[in-house]
Regions:
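PLP-dependent enzyme catalytic core of the Aspartate aminotransferase-like
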Residues: 54, 58-62, 66, 88, ...
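Active-site phosphate-binding strand-loop segment of PLP-dependent enzymes
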Residues: 147-204
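Conserved PLP-binding catalytic core of the aspartate aminotransferase-like
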Residues: 294-305, 314-347, 370-372, 376, ...
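A conserved beta-strand-loop-helix scaffold within acyl/acetyltransferase catalytic domains
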Residues: 426-517, 567-568, 576-734
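Active-site PLP attachment segment
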Residues: 223-259
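Conserved N-terminal alpha-helix of the aminotransferase class I/II PLP-enzyme fold
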Residues: 58-104
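Acyl-donor binding region in acyl/amide transferases
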Residues: 480-482, 488, 494-495, 501-599, ...
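Conserved PLP-anchoring active-site segment centered on the Schiff-base-forming lysine
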Residues: 114-130
């Protein structure tokens, strides 16, 4: 995640969109200069434009003259008297105990670990601000359960409350009043109803973007919609509309106020707001309580109304139309958003982006804010310009209004008189594409020539899997295996791919401890954290799943076309994730830039463990090629115990033998947390038992058991020995080192059969190195089309 985010941000920095500095000697309006160029700034959250208020600036000067630039003492020991004046003024506005903090984020970090106690439970809205999500991690460290609901889904919230109320002391719902990405509102009337109906429900709500511009005396959106409930803590900002510094926590009673002030970590260990900005805060609070303040709000309300009206007239879309000053225009992938922002900059307008990871990868957009420093004419001209640049930018990136409508599931938009015809380069002029629903439609020799040396996605395997994974009772055992080939005008294959639409576990590649927790939760809900995925290859096969002819001059266009096809199929099939696999490091380097622009992020897959040097003559020769560490391990852990085992190479024939082999596999599957996949059906094993390309190795303990204690199921493909599945009896596995022993016997078997290479598949790197395997870097590229499962898994960490 961090590496992918770094690449996305750095791309935007390199394109001159992010991490810029103003070059103004003085800023006195909504205009800013960046690199010497003037822009009208629509990226400011100072909604009422009070940063240029003479009253506030004079207060800053006076406070500085009286108290200096800082008063550097923890509030636990001593606060400058301006704090008391500011908190008293805020109390008059809100009629609730007010605790001023150095920032809204520091307020969350101070309050939440004190308010949320042992036995409580937290429910987060999916879109709640990052600062609350970060603070929730502290609660998780204190063993507080964290749950997440879809954005503004009150039915899901009530369902969670009913589920948790018997065991929880308190249930804390955490939300925003005005959400910072989409500018939409929390459904406060419904939340208030739930607070009244469920005694254990409590509300912690951040109204940073609602403060000032609305509500009586500017007390914000939340308090404009409901009274301060006696089970509600309100956090808001003294930045943004308030134009000062810091945050404020509003409590329903003095006891909560006292406890957070006494015990909140950032109240003790963080620095205070400094005198100049305390002066600004006091002046702003006085202004909020003045007769003229309502005029500022009314003026701003007219601008919000005008902006919504103008967007509608121009046919520009909004994800959620509200009366907030924060607007989100749906676009799509990050590269599309950046294209439009760059175009708007060239026209003299500075807008923000909203994208991954705050939104799903394909659901980024333009984010702009209006404020009282803007005139109606400023807003009108910016939106008129945006209408044109929005469409041109979409088309330049291969998108369209229709695509945005489909992706965001919003109503069709754009004034028909403005709609432009675009002339895209048609792919059929450079290659032909074939979408196939069965491997039977593809010549086996041609297909295997591309794939047989690189894993198990070979013709005969795919033919079997098509038969096995259809018409089954279990959802996870019904796969749609499809094929996509792209040929140039001479008929040569430029790209060939097999891909599968299947129900998969969302923790497929999650860390072991997290997968272990999820595995426990699946004992109650078998399909917990599962979703429909598209992955290249199949959930059973491994190795190369996309062939690309990098020598063909059109390979990049072919790859883009393939990804676009997968994304279209994902949209039509309610797919949550797309995973392209498996690529070596050189391949990854060639394609990562293209795929990142298409919204797919690099994923480090488990190493592939391969014995590719088969020139050794005997065990001593094999051992001589290992490092000293692994020579010792092979001798002491494996060869020393080899005499305890009988080894048989046979195909399971009788029903009992076949079923027992399956049981040994199930033992391993039930213990595995490194790669989370569904248990394979017995139906597949029956195909394997009958397939002459499969080789079976059984281990028996000479003195301990009449039944095999381990089995390795491998497939020989084009003289490569592919270890597919292992089975173990855990009554003996650890004591006798059965897994290590069967790995060694697998290597010996492949050598005996004259195979040129052994593919020992993924995981258990250390054990496989002991028998001569070398780890090969293995990469994938993934796109999460929705955030829900990712956020849910984060809450379980």
């Amino acid at each position: 995640m961090i590496n992918s985010l770094d690449k996305i941000i750095q791309d935007a920095v390199d394109r001159g969109v992010l991490q810029k500095l103003t070059s103004d000697e003085q800023i006195i309006s909504s205009e800013v200069h960046i690199d010497g160029i003037k822009y009208l700034n629509f990226g400011s959250c100072s909604y009422l434009g009070l940063e240029h208020s003479k009253l506030l600036k004079e207060a800053v000067k006076n406070a500085t003259e009286k108290y200096g630039t800082q008063f550097s003492t923890s509030r636990t020991y001593l606060s400058i008297g301006l704090y008391e004046e500011l908190e008293s003024s805020l109390y008059k506005m809100f009629q609730k105990p007010a605790l001023v903090t150095a920032s809204t984020t520091l307020g969350h970090l101070s309050a939440l670990p004190i308010l949320v106690e042992e036995g409580d439970v937290v429910i987060l809205d999916l879109q709640v601000h990052s600062s609350i999500q970060m603070s929730a991690q502290l609660l998780k460290a204190n063993k507080i359960p964290i749950h997440i609901i879809p954005h503004n889904d009150m039915a899901a919230l009530e369902k969670k409350i009913k589920l948790l109320q018997e065991k929880a002391n308190k249930i804390w719902y955490m939300a925003d009043g005005v959400y910072s990405m989409y500018g939409d509102f929390a459904p406060l009337k419904k939340i208030q109803s739930l607070l009244n109906r469920y005694k254990k429900l409590h509300l912690y709500i951040d109204d940073a973007h609602g403060m000032g511009w609305t509500g009586d005396q500017g007390i914000g959106y939340v308090r404009s919609q409901m009274e301060h409930h006696d089970k509600m803590i309100l956090a808001t900002s003294l930045n943004k509309s308030f134009a000062a510094s810091g945050g404020v926590l509003l409590f329903p009673n003095k006891e909560m106020y006292r406890k957070v002030k006494n015990c909140g970590s950032t109240m003790i260990f963080s620095g205070p707001i400094q005198p100049p900005m305390l002066g600004a805060g006091i002046a702003s609070a006085k202004l909020h309580q003045s007769d003229e303040f309502k005029d500022l709000q009314d003026e701003f309300e007219q601008k919000i109304t005008f902006t919504n009206h103008k967007l509608s007239v121009l046919g520009l879309p909004q994800y959620a139309r509200t009366n907030s000053p924060l607007f989100f225009i749906p676009v799509g992938l990050p590269t599309m958003v950046l294209n439009i922002i760059e175009r708007m900059k060239r026209k003299g307008y500075y807008l923000n982006s909203a994208g991954f990871p705050a939104t799903p990868m394909k659901k980024g957009g333009l984010r702009f804010m209006i404020n009282n420093n803007h005139t109606i004419e400023d807003i009108d001209q910016m939106l008129t310009t945006l209408q044109q640049e929005y469409i041109v930018g979409l088309h330049a990136e291969g998108s369209s209004p229709e695509e945005v409508t489909k992706q965001f599931k919003i109503a069709p938009f754009i004034n028909p008189t403005f709609k432009k015809q675009i002339h895209k380069k048609e792919n059929w002029q450079i290659f032909k594409e074939y979408q196939l629903s069965s491997i039977k439609e593809i010549d086996s020799e041609e297909w295997n020539a591309l794939f047989s040396k690189h894993g198990s996605n070979v013709h005969q395997n795919l033919k079997q899997l098509e038969q096995v994974f259809k018409g089954n009772k279990e959802l996870e055992n019904n796969w749609e295996i499809k094929y996509h080939t792209i040929r140039d005008t001479e008929g040569n294959i430029v790209l060939a791919s097999v891909y599968t639409i299947a129900l998969m576990m969302d923790d497929l590649l999650a860390e072991k401890t997290l997968s272990g927790k999820i595995k426990e939760l699946r004992k109650k809900d078998r399909l917990y954290l599962t979703s429909k995925n598209i992955l290249t290859g199949t959930p059973f096969t491994k190795g190369k799943s996309i062939y690309i002819d990098y020598e063909n001059k059109h390979w990049k266009e072919a790859l883009k076309s393939h990804v676009n096809l997968l994304q279209d199929i994902a949209d039509k099939n309610n797919v949550s994730n797309i995973l392209l696999r498996e690529f070596c490091r050189d391949q990854k380097t060639s394609i990562e830039g293209i795929l990142m622009n298409l919204g797919l992020l690099e994923v480090q897959l488990p190493h592939n463990l391969v014995v590719d040097d088969m020139t050794w003559e005997n065990t001593n020769d094999l051992m001589s090629r290992l490092s000293q560490k692994y020579r010792y391990s092979l001798r002491k852990e494996i060869l020393k115990r080899e005499g305890q085992f009988e080894v048989e190479f046979k195909r399971p024939t009788g029903k009992h033998e076949q079923e027992y082999t399956f049981e040994l596999y199930k033992n391993v599957h039930s213990q595995s947390t490194e790669i989370s996949v569904f248990e394979l059906p017995y139906k597949l094993f029956q195909k394997m038992y009958a397939d002459p390309s499969y080789d079976f190795i059984y281990l028996y303990l000479k003195e301990a058991s009449e039944k095999p204690v381990a089995v390795m199921m491998s497939q020989i493909i084009d003289n490569i020995y592919n270890a597919q599945l292992v089975g173990l009896d855990y009554n003996y596995a650890r004591e006798y080192g059965c897994y290590k022993q069967i790995l060694y016997q697998t290597v010996k078997r492949a050598k005996y059969l004259g195979c040129e290479k052994i593919d020992l598949a993924y995981t258990a790197d250390m054990e496989k190195k002991k028998v001569g395997a070398k780890p090969k870097d293995n990469f994938g590229f993934a796109m999460a089309l929705e955030h829900d499962s990712y956020v849910e898994m984060q809450s379980l960490k």
